[in-house]
């Protein structure tokens, strides 16, 4: 896949993306415990039966889209190792299945930067889903935030719980859990009640959760995070998230600059 020059890739230190088409005639195994990715061609790994897997649902592209069970409902999801976290819940799927999800918080803003830059601000919900079943392995109390995208994603965190094998040639998906039994995922994620991203050649508040909606505004300039000046910080999501993640405990502060005045604002992590 050839894409135009993009600072997103430069910040990551990578030159591009390998899509599913690169593995169209292969079987790819992700094994986090061994810290390896194995590509088999053209044969399946030994002792792996076609009947042990489930079908890939995308008939036209080499995308790892499969059916999982969300409560008592079938849900198409894309397994994507490029997506952080466990569940990235699309707003459309949430709206369709809202009666089985518990909303714990509301927000407004931009969820994240992508290869095409920042999206538009949207309404966001923080939710907890009672159960997701992936090939017989049940994950309970699964937390996520809603995201405007084409479909729900199961992200790279799935690899913490089992080996994933994708047979692109025979269009089969396998999940082999490391342990038996249900896994409690801990509910809605604990996130800072504001998010900060590079925008308009500075750092701005780009997501506001309910507890902060009367304290800060979308687009407020942030010049300091918990004692770390952003003056020389690289204009990247990774850089600012590294600073946020380094804040000890569940409380901290930011300094915003508005109308040439600086103001210290307390922030905290919330579910």
Where are these regions (language model features)?
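Pepsin/retropepsin-fold aspartyl endopeptidases
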Residues: 1-271
């Amino acid at each position: 896949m050839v894409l135009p020059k993009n600072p997103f890739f430069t910040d990551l230190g990578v030159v591009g993306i390998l899509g599913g088409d690169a593995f169209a005639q292969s079987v790819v195994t992700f094994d986090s415990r061994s810290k390896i990715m194995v590509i088999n061609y053209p044969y399946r790994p030994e002792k792996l039966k076609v009947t042990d897997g489930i079908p890939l649902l995308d008939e036209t592209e080499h995308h790892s889209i499969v059916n999982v069970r969300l409560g008592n409902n079938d849900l198409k999801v894309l397994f994507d190792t490029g997506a952080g976290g466990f569940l990235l819940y699309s707003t459309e799927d949430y709206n369709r299945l809202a009666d089985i999800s518990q909303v714990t918080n509301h927000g407004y803003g931009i969820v994240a930067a992508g290869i095409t830059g920042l999206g538009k601000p949207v309404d966001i919900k923080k939710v907890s889903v009672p159960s997701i079943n992936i090939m017989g392995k049940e994950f309970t109390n699964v937390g996520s935030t809603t995201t405007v995208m084409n479909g729900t994603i199961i992200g790279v965190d799935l690899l913490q719980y089992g080996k994933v094998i994708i047979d692109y040639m025979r269009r089969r998906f396998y999940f082999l859990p490391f342990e038996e039994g249900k896994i409690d995922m801990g509910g809605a994620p604990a996130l800072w009640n504001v998010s900060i991203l590079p925008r308009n050649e500075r750092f701005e508040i780009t997501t506001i959760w309910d507890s902060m909606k009367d304290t800060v505004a979308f687009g407020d300039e942030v010049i300091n995070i918990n004692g770390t000046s952003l003056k020389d910080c690289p204009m990247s999501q990774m850089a600012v998230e590294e600073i946020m993640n380094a804040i000890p405990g569940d409380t901290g502060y930011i300094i915003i600059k508005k109308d040439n005045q600086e103001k210290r604002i307390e922030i905290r992590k919330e579910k």
